[in-house]
Regions:
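Cysteine endopeptidase catalytic domains of the caspase/legumain-like
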Residues: 7, 18-332
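Sec-dependent N-terminal signal peptides
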Residues: 4-13
Length: 332
């Protein structure tokens, strides 16, 4: 009996200590580098035609910090895009495809998205909405079906997808987006293939809520918390079990609404549960400063004597301009 009481006291003390450790600033630092993991992080908060997604920029910025510090992924292996257009999303996913094509089975790919999701009312397909997209026109976004098809075709040893978005037509605050007409729509789950596992923040007809007190999406917060507590040495099975339990319980208590994270893997496979986020646990923790997420400002216009900076968008526009000129000169 005394042992049980002692165990309960120790467990309570441990929980109290961890409760004081901010996931944003108290980070496990791994001295072992992981040069074969490549990631694309997309954080869409400030929409042009839709409501903001609270804390989405913070979600992505801190997830990047955990990839670098706790999992040991070099910064050059990570593409982080704040408030991404559809062109930005496709451009960075294409980068990931090119890298994995070169690295083949040596590579592990990670894709993280925080922002609006949207269902097509007719087809019930789910879409990720870029900041220049319209909820009334889901095809202005990127369908999860197309995304999974692209990622599943990559020859990576593992492909992990984390989506802090919902596809019912509701916003992170819980009310409905313009196109949803006040009714939650249950979007179809797109099939996955290859060595891919998809973690989603909520079931098809649920809302992915924020955790206001922590300034994160509810799903992302507990994803980060498990990476923090495990110092990175956690299997996907352990991560899934923890995040699902914590999100479901917290959402009922805080939001009085259900939010149930889901995991989708190729049919008939369970070995993904043994995959590890980091091969070795980080051996030390560091207290870091808070990140103030910002959107990178556009570069000022170059002087007439200089060539303008070539961004993915300007490169694409230049290519299209050259193509159009060639077509005009050489009509079929």
């Amino acid at each position: 009996m005394k042992r049980l009481i002692l165990f309960a006291l120790v467990s309570t003390l441990v929980q109290m200590v961890w409760a004081q450790k901010d996931v944003d600033t108290y980070i496990a630092v791994n001295e072992v580098e992981d040069p074969n993991t490549y990631a694309v992080i997309i954080s869409n908060e400030n929409y042009k035609h839709e409501a903001k997604v609270p804390f989405a920029l913070n979600d992505g910025a801190i997830f990047k910090r955990y990839l670098m510090k706790t999992l040991g992924v070099p910064e050059q292996n990570i593409k982080y895009v704040a408030d991404a257009s559809l062109n930005d999303m496709n451009y960075n996913l294409s980068w990931l495809e090119r890298v994995v094509k070169v690295k083949q089975k040596e590579a592990r790919a990670i894709v993280y998205y925080s922002g609006h999701g949207m269902p097509d009312e007719d087809s019930k397909k789910a879409y990720l909405l870029p900041v220049d997209g319209y909820s009334t026109e889901p095809t202005s976004g990127l369908s999860t079906e197309a995304l999974y098809k692209r990622l599943g075709a990559m020859p990576a040893s593992q492909t992990l997808v984390f989506l802090d978005a919902c596809f019912s037509g509701s916003k992170r605050e819980g009310d409905m987006m313009k196109a949803a007409r006040g009714v939650a729509i249950k979007a179809k789950s797109a099939p996955v293939s290859g060595n891919m596992v998809v973690f989603s923040a909520a079931q098809g007809n649920e809302t992915a809520y924020p955790l206001q007190s922590k300034e994160h999406g509810l799903f992302t917060y507990f994803l980060l918390e498990k990476l923090q507590k495990s110092a990175g040495a956690v299997t996907l099975g352990e991560l899934s079990d923890y995040v699902t339990k914590q999100v479901a319980e917290t959402s009922i208590v805080v939001n009085e609404k259900s939010q149930t994270p889901t995991v989708t893997a190729p049919v008939g496979t369970t070995d993904w549960r043994n995959w590890k986020m980091a091969n070795k646990a980080a051996k030390k923790f560091e207290t870091m400063s808070k990140i103030v997420p910002t959107v990178q400002a556009e570069a000022p216009a170059a002087a007439n004597t200089a060539q303008p900076a070539q961004t993915p968008k300007t490169r694409q526009r230049s290519f299209l301009k050259r193509n159009n000129t060639a077509n005009q000169e050489n009509p079929e």
